[in-house]
A protein has these predicted regions:
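Predominantly soluble domains enriched in secretory-pathway, periplasmic, or organellar proteins
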Residues: 1-262
């Protein structure tokens, strides 16, 4: 509530099935499993917006959305990542699946997340790794799997304008896949919902400071801790201060345009 933990509910991801559990802390009982039916795994962590409007779930390993089959040779074309924003009904103490939505992402591997607060309320931030889109295949002369997923010095922090995404849902600018509302990657880019900014390789956590002014990223394979300024990132977005776009068309902010310190 208002960015402060109130101890009423607990949310946790089911890593092997891509579901979210809602636990009522009055009796410590699991009241609900919510399944979006688009992704069959997640990182396990869940993160809530300042007034628990949404519970944020990041898919970890890319797959064809909805569980359809596609050969690994079509990884870049057919596989996708996902960020799900589960609408929470506090009065009922349940996730409202019908009013939840997901944002289609490139087939990088999404990791931990956090929601903005105060000046950054309405935004969310999520790590990623394997922006190399490595799929293994050492027997075919490709790099070993772990080495393949860690070749680059930088991965991408995903920056979401979830308030704008919510407006798109209300305006009907979404698809329905397996009965779940989905903002396509194309729409997310065109409508300014999704941006990337480089972050040191294989990060494991992005935490918003209590003031909501800074995002702190640290990783498993890169020693520095990187602090990003929300205002600097917002200014860069408004100025279109991009270093490039990824191959899916997502704008990439310049690292130094958003970095506060390291």
């Amino acid at each position: 509530t208002n960015g402060e933990y109130d101890g009423q509910f607990l949310f946790i991801g089911d890593k092997s099935h891509g579901r979210i559990a809602t636990i009522d802390l009055r009796d410590y009982e699991t009241k609900q499993f919510a399944d979006g039916k688009l992704m069959h795994n997640d990182h396990g962590g869940c993160f809530v917006t300042p007034n628990t409007e949404y519970v944020i779930e990041g898919a970890q390993y890319a797959e064809p959305l909805g569980g359809e089959y596609a050969p690994i040779s079509q990884y870049k074309e057919k596989y996708r990542g996902l960020a799900t924003f589960w609408k929470f009904d506090r009065q009922k103490g349940r996730i409202d699946v019908e009013n939840s939505f997901a944002i289609e992402l490139p087939p990088y591997w999404q990791d931990l997340a956090d929601a903005g607060k105060g000046p950054s309320d309405g935004w969310a931030f999520m790590n990623s790794f394997n922006t190399e889109m490595a799929t293994g295949g050492i027997e075919k002369g490709n790099p070993p799997f772990e080495a393949g997923t860690t070749q680059r010095d930088m991965d991408y922090m995903h920056v979401f304008n979830w308030k704008k995404a919510e407006e798109l849902i209300k305006a009907g600018k979404f698809e329905v896949k397996n009965g779940f509302k989905l903002i396509s990657l194309k729409t997310a880019v065109e409508e300014g919902v999704l941006f990337f900014i480089p972050e040191p390789k294989s990060p494991h956590g992005v935490d918003v400071t209590p003031s909501g002014k800074y995002m702190v990223v640290a990783g498993k394979l890169d020693p520095p801790v990187t602090i990003y300024s929300f205002w600097k990132m917002l200014k860069a977005i408004e100025a279109k201060d991009f270093e490039d776009k990824d191959e899916y068309g997502v704008p990439i902010l310049r690292f130094d345009a958003g970095k506060e310190a390291q």
